[in-house]
Structures are given as C-alpha cells and as structure tokens.
C-alpha cells in the first residue's frame, strides 16, 4: 500500500496563506507541471535544487534540503536580521514526510525517517548573484564598487561575531539600493547580501585566524568561478583576480579597523556613529570625532564650572555643533560643490584643516581661512567664492562661542 506523504509547515503566519497552496507533495523540480508560477531568475551554482516562485502577494526562493539543516538555516537568518546584517528574509521551512526507509539490522527491521525539507525565503527583488557579475568585463572602478559591497558585508558579519562558514561568490547577492545618508538625503549604493546561511556560526567574537580563514576561503571561491567561466568558454585574466584579492584584503583591513574603533567610540560615548553620522571609511576619522568631542567636553565643563560626562558632551556637541554645521552644508548645497563628500566627511576635513593650518602658523587661523584653503586645495572654482563666504559666515556663527573660549587649543 502506497504511503501518503504528510506535510508539516513551520512558517511565519504572514506567509502561511500563500505557502499552503503550493504542491509540497511533489519534488520542487517537478513544480512546473502543476501550474506553479516559476520565475526565470539567473542564479549562481547551487549544491541543492532551488526554485523561485510567485505565489499570491509574494515571491519566494525555495531550496530542497534536510530538515535539520533547513531548521538551522531559518534560525540563522532570523539571528542575522536581528543583528542588522544584510541577508535574506526567512519565511520558514516546510517538511514532506515520505514513506520511512526500511533498514534490515541484526536486531530486526528498523525504519528510518524519510523527510525532505524546504528552506523558504522571500525573494530579494532586482538582484544578481555576484557569480554572474563576476563574468562581465567591468572597468576597475566598477569592479571595485562590487568588491567594496562584499567587503562591507564581511566586516558587518565579523564585527558581529558571525562566521559565514561558506563565504563564496555563489552565496552572495548584489543589489542597488537607495539609502538615507545623514544630512545628505537618499543615495544609491551597491549592497551585498548573504544568501546561504546553512553553515553560519554566531559567536561572541571571531579570532584573527577565523577571519583570515574566511577570507582565504572566499579567495578560493574566486578561483572556482574562474574555472567555471573557463569551462564555459569565458577567460578571465589571472592578474586581475590577484589584484582583486589584494584590493579585498586591503579594504577589509581598513574597514575592520574602522568597525573596531566605532565600537570603542560607542562604548565611550553611548553614541552610534552609523546611525547619527553615517558611514565612515577612514579609521582616523573616528579618532578625530572623539578629539572634537573631548574638546567640547572641556569647553562646556569650563562654561558650567563642573565636570561633564563624555556621553553628555557627545549629545551636546551633536546638537549644538555637528547638526547645525551639517545643515549648513546641506542647505547651501555644499555637498554639490564638493562632489563625493558626505556632510560628516566635510565636517572632519574642514575642522582638521583648521587645526593643521593653526599649528603651522602657530596661531588660530579661524574658520574663514581654513574654509578658503580647503576649497582652494580641492579645486573649487572662482564662481563659488560668494557661496563659500556665505557658508563660512554661517559656520562661524555656530562655532563663535567655542572660538572665544579656546581660540588656539588643539
């Protein structure tokens, strides 16, 4: 007598209505026959059978795998999302219980469970696997933008104690995304998403050797992609691959250093840089922000004639100095005058330039001179002079009380 398969659903209630009508009693490779709306989406090489479907309000990626791994993978996705890591949104897992497998043992017939599970995730729209992007002949600048996105994902994972375990191009999705940049507005970025969480391990922190092993494994995956491309008739310059590896390693080391400094900064100030200032790609900028805050702490302590905590000084500096200056940059469109610079970068670079010039001149040069020098060295045209004066005057209005208090303090 033929065994009737049993279907068990372990899915988020949001997606339950759509998922229950799919033909789970069949292997997903055969779903086209029952009229399931299969989506034709390019993807990288996969070890398991994967289909993409549109069902009701949602599009799903469905991977056929063992129940134990499927359960763990869904839990991993949930943990990654709680940590703010760019990854897939899990819908849950669905198990088909087939007829048990009979195994003859010395003590008699034993029946092993024969369960086939399916990891179900929400489909990320308008995204390409990096293995597809990797086959294209991009200019170095654009290739670096793709690699930057991947490095940021690595730093995000490792900074949160997450060991990917199967870091590879095939398990990475790349997507153009609009994100809000503080005091600048929406900008488009390339973002990398972790798209396979089977082997993810979440720890308190990762050792240097684990992080190094993860990167080396990823470098091996680049070689595998090269071999796959070669087999399909596409040849990629080995020199370019080696250059890419060096670029990834160098960028990773810099951004991981930034990540460590940001965490220390938050411990000292109770202030999240990413949330309030935006992304920073230079480790020294974190140190400079802290220096400015410590200076502001001294200033308000002198003004109030009492000790001020670093956390209180940070909040006051942000409210009375940083925000007003960045609003000047935004309102006067100075970000357009200095293309590619964020408001936070402009703040640091102009203030740092003032410190540098004052040290060279052995006197306080003032904001106006510092701004003019910064503009001149970064190639601002003559027609921006009136705008520059207007901006400088507004910046001076913000900084005047501090200028009066310690004109030459460094």
Task: Kindly give the residue locations of the regions a language model identified.
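Conserved ATP-binding subdomain of kinase catalytic cores across diverse folds
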Residues: 20-132, 136-137, 153-160, 164, ...
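Low-complexity, highly charged intrinsically disordered N-terminal segments
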Residues: 2-10, 53, 64
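C-lobe/activation-segment region of protein kinase-like
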Residues: 186-266
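Activation-loop N-terminal segment of eukaryotic-like protein kinases
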Residues: 174-188
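Intrinsically disordered, low-complexity, repeat-rich regions
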Residues: 239-251, 269-273, 278-285, 290, ...
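Hydrophobic residue at the +6 position relative to the catalytic HRD Asp in the kinase catalytic loop
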Residues: 167, 172-174
């Amino acid at each position: 007598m033929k065994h009737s398969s049993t279907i068990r659903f372990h899915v988020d209630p949001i997606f339950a209505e759509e998922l229950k009508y799919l033909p789970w009693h069949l292997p997903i490779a055969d779903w086209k026959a029952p009229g399931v709306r299969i989506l034709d989406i390019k993807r990288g090489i996969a070890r398991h059978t994967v289909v993409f479907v549109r069902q009701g309000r949602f599009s799903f990626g469905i991977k056929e795998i063992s129940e134990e791994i499927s359960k763990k993978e869904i839990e991993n996705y949930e943990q990654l999302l709680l940590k703010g890591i760019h990854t897939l949104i899990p819908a849950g897992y669905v198990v088909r219980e087939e007829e048990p497998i009979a195994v003859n043992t010395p003590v008699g017939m034993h029946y092993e469970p024969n369960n086939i599970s399916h990891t179900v995730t929400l489909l990320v729209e308008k995204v390409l696997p990096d293995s597809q992007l990797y086959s294209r002949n991009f200019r170095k600048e654009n290739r670096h933008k793709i690699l930057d996105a991947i490095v940021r994902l690595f730093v995000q994972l490792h900074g949160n104690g997450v060991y990917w375990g199967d870091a590879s191009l095939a398990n990475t999705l790349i997507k153009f995304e609009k994100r809000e940049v503080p005091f600048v507005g929406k900008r488009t970025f390339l973002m990398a998403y972790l798209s396979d969480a089977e082997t993810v391990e979440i720890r308190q922190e990762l050792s240097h050797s684990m992080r190094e092993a993860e990167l080396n494994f990823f470098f091996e995956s680049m070689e595998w992609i090269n071999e796959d491309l070669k087999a399909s008739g596409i040849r990629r310059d080995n020199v370019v691959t080696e250059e890419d590896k060096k670029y990834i390693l160098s960028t990773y080391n810099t951004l991981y250093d930034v990540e460590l400094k940001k965490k220390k900064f938050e411990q000292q100030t109770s202030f999240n840089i990413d949330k309030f200032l935006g992304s920073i790609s230079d480790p020294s900028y974190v140190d400079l922000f802290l220096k400015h805050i410590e200076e502001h702490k001294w200033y308000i302590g002198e003004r109030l004639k009492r000790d001020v905590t670093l956390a209180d000084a940070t909040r006051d500096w942000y409210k009375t100095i940083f925000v007003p200056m960045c609003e000047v940059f935004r309102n006067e469109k100075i970000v357009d005058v200095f293309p590619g610079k964020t408001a936070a970068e402009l703040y640091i670079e102009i203030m740092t330039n003032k410190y540098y010039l004052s040290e060279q001149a052995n006197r306080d040069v003032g904001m106006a001179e510092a701004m003019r020098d910064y503009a001149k060295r970064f190639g601002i045209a003559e027609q921006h002079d009136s705008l520059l004066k207007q901006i400088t005057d507004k910046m001076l209005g913000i900084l005047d009380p501090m200028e009066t208090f310690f004109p030459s303090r460094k």
